């Protein structure tokens, strides 16, 4: 019988699954549940060593002799500090070592309870990774716990070998051993390249070929990659390709970009039917909340993330494999290894998404964004500020020769204008910037320098506050909400824009917009940058947005 603590069960099951076999066990009360469970697994060879300082070096010897990582488990408090010399040796000798420490719950650290000290990250820079496991009470806790353990074990041999530290908080009661079996756990694997000299990848291709519903989701990529013609058809026909404008031209063919609205419109039955069996991802962040929710609720059997840095990014909660290589090299490598069995899955997605209409709304924030996007000259660069701007732009088709930029690393509203101005300063193309009022005024000092030219066209959407916050569930429109959440204001950019040498234009309605859009989007060279400030009504903006999405829901009823 094993401990009933789920974080312990996850840890032990993953040590076993990752092939860790040699474990040094130090006596103690707080770690007794871990020790008891480890000692009762036949796959492990356990060694009892009382002195933790000696135990750490003993574990180094085990690892050196076997090649794979060995583990050492100790109780809480100063016992852990006694492993420090061995951890330092393992780090500088590059020996894979897993240090497992039991701990009290965080609430009792520093409260004069016995045998306690702040254990997370106690080894500082002398370990490759340090993780503090959650105590598992929810499904999300269990997913988080599983991910942390996978990350730590994989890190022992990633880009060189070395020690890692796994800290395991354990609440009372500690000594309940009621679990009859170890749980079935998700094991994350890593391929460092696809080379027969590094790791046999035939098994990987066999896994890929057994699925019919294959999807690729591409996140933000600040580049353009044109696939050679010979790769385009073999790759394109086998997958449903989804990306956003921020993915730019990084797909072998024409991708599906309106999937956010499409997923929102689907019935539960259609969502289930169109869910992928395997998901491959590359690139950075995805804006779509609908896609994140969809793939978390309908997880594929496998999720492979392809990234040159090999880091674990489990956005959809179902990651199974990390492939550490350039994503384009990966795709070109597998292109001719894919089987030729017919699949209708890509067409299912293409045909359904073609039924989703673009917004055709009255004068509003969304309609203004759509009008500019349709009028963009090619080639040019389009910079999208965060919050509503980047989301609403996704509802429209962007011309193919338009490069898209956005600060989606942390997704804050600050710095959107400064980043765009900096980009334009080194660009020979026209640079269009769509930005909301809060983001613009927050970053208005972006124009307080001399390092920009006439190739800048700023579309400032001013509805006197952050209207997107009123679309959030539970947000009322009281005076307090308007003041503290929407941050209502009555500011205009006119004086600042003209002071900084911009041609300023003001729009308050559809006719003025039509008149201003032609000079604003003209590719003709001008002597000054331009700022077009468009005023809309935030109540109308949110109402029209809701009506559009309500119409999508009704299309299948």
From Swiss-Prot:
Q: Which residues form a coiled coil?
A: none
Task: List, in alphabetical order, the Gene Ontology terms for molecular function in this entry.
Answer: 2-succinyl-5-enolpyruvyl-6-hydroxy-3-cyclohexene-1-carboxylic-acid synthase activity; magnesium ion binding; manganese ion binding; thiamine pyrophosphate binding
Supply the alphabetized keyword list. Magnesium, Manganese, Menaquinone biosynthesis, Metal-binding, Thiamine pyrophosphate, Transferase
State the SUPFAM superfamilies in the record: Thiamin diphosphate-binding fold (THDP-binding) (SSF52518)
Gene3D superfamilies reported in the protein's UniProt record: 3.40.50.970, TPP-binding domain
Q: Which cofactor does it need?
A: Mg(2+); Mn(2+); thiamine diphosphate
What S-S linkages are listed for this chain? none
Pfam families (UniProt xref): TPP_enzyme_N
Q: What processes in GO biological process is this protein linked to? A: menaquinone biosynthetic process
Cleavable signal peptide: none
Give its E.C. classification number. 2.2.1.9
Q: Cofactor comment in the record?
A: Binds 1 thiamine pyrophosphate per subunit.
Top EC class per UniProt? transferase
- Which CDD domains is this protein grouped with? TPP_PYR_MenD, TPP_SHCHC_synthase
Name the pathway. Quinol/quinone metabolism; 1,4-dihydroxy-2-naphthoate biosynthesis; 1,4-dihydroxy-2-naphthoate from chorismate: step 2/7; Quinol/quinone metabolism; menaquinone biosynthesis
Catalytic activity from the UniProt record: isochorismate + 2-oxoglutarate + H(+) = 5-enolpyruvoyl-6-hydroxy-2-succinyl-cyclohex-3-ene-1-carboxylate + CO2
InterPro entries the record matches: MenaQ_synth_MenD, THDP-binding, Thiamin_PyroP_enz_TPP-bd_dom
UniProt family annotation: Belongs to the TPP enzyme family. MenD subfamily.
| Function description | Catalyzes the thiamine diphosphate-dependent decarboxylation of 2-oxoglutarate and the subsequent addition of the resulting succinic semialdehyde-thiamine pyrophosphate anion to isochorismate to yield 2-succinyl-5-enolpyruvyl-6-hydroxy-3-cyclohexene-1-carboxylate (SEPHCHC).
Per UniProt, subunit arrangement is: Homodimer.
Query: What is the name listed in the Swiss-Prot or TrEMBL entry for this protein?
Result: 2-succinyl-5-enolpyruvyl-6-hydroxy-3-cyclohexene-1-carboxylate synthase
Gene source species: Phocaeicola vulgatus (strain ATCC 8482 / DSM 1447 / JCM 5826 / CCUG 4940 / NBRC 14291 / NCTC 11154)
Q: Provide the taxonomic classification.
A: Bacteria, Pseudomonadati, Bacteroidota, Bacteroidia, Bacteroidales
Its gene is menD
């Amino acid at each position: 019988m094993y401990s009933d603590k789920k974080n312990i069960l996850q840890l032990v099951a993953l040590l076993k699954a990752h092939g860790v076999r040699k474990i040094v066990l130090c006596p103690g009360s707080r770690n007794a549940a871990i020790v008891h469970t480890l000692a009762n697994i036949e796959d492990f060879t356990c060694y009892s060593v009382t002195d933790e300082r000696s135990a750490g070096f003993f574990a180094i010897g085990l690892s050196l002799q076997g090649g794979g990582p060995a583990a050492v488990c100790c109780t809480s408090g100063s016992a852990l500090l006694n492993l420090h010399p061995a951890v330092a040796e393992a780090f500088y000798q590059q020996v894979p070592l897993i240090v497992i420490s039991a701990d009290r719950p965080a609430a009792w650290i520093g409260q004069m309870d016995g045998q306690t000290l702040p254990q997370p990250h106690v080894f500082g820079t002398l370990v490759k990774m340090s993780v503090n496991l959650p105590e598992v009470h929810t499904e999300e806790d269990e997913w988080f716990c599983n991910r942390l353990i996978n990350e730590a074990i994989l890190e022992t041999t990633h880009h060189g070998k070395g020690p890692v530290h796994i800290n395991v908080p354990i609440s009372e009661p500690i000594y309940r051993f009621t679990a009859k079996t170890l749980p079935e756990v998700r094991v994350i694997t890593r391929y460092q390249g696809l080379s027969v000299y590094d790791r046999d990848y035939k098994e990987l291709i066999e896994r890929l070929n057994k699925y019919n519903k294959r999807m690729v989701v591409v996140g933000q990529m600040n580049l353009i990659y044109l696939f050679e013609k010979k790769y385009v058809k073999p790759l394109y026909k086998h997958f449903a390709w989804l990306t956003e404008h921020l993915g730019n031209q990084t797909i072998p063919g024409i991708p599906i970009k309106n999937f956010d609205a499409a997923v929102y419109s689907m019935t539960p039955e259609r969502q289930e039917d169109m869910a992928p069996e395997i998901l491959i991802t590359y690139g950075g962040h995805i804006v779509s909340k609908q896609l994140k929710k969809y793939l978390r609720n309908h997880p594929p059997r496998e999720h492979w993330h392809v990234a040159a840095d090999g880091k674990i990014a489990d956005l959809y909660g179902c990651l199974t494999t990390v492939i550490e290589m350039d994503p384009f090299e990966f795709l070109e490598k597998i292109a001719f290894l894919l089987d030729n069995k017919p699949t209708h899955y890509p067409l299912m997605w293409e045909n359904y998404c073609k039924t989703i209409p673009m917004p055709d709304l009255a004068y509003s924030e969304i309609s203004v964004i759509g009008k500019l996007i349709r009028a963009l000259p090619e080639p040019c660069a389009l910079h999208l500020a965060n919050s509503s701007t980047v989301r609403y732009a996704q509802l429209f088709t962007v011309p193919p020769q338009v490069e898209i930029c956005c600060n989606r690393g942390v997704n804050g509203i600050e710095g959107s204008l400064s980043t765009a101005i900096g980009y334009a300063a080194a660009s020979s193309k026209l640079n269009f910037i769509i930005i909301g009022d809060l983001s613009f005024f927050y970053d208005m000092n972006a124009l307080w320098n001399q390092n920009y030219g006439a190739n800048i066209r700023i579309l400032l959407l001013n509805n006197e506050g952050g209207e997107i916050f009123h679309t959030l569930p539970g947000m009322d429109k009281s005076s307090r909400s308007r003041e503290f959440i929407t941050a209502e204001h009555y500011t205009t950019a006119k004086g600042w824009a003209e002071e900084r040498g911009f041609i300023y234009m003001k729009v308050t309605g559809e006719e003025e917009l039509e008149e201003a859009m032609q000079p604003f989007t003209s590719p003709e060279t001008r002597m000054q940058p331009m700022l077009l400030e468009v005023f809309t009504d935030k109540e109308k903006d949110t109402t029209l947005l809701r009506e559009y999405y309500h119409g999508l829901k009704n299309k299948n009823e």
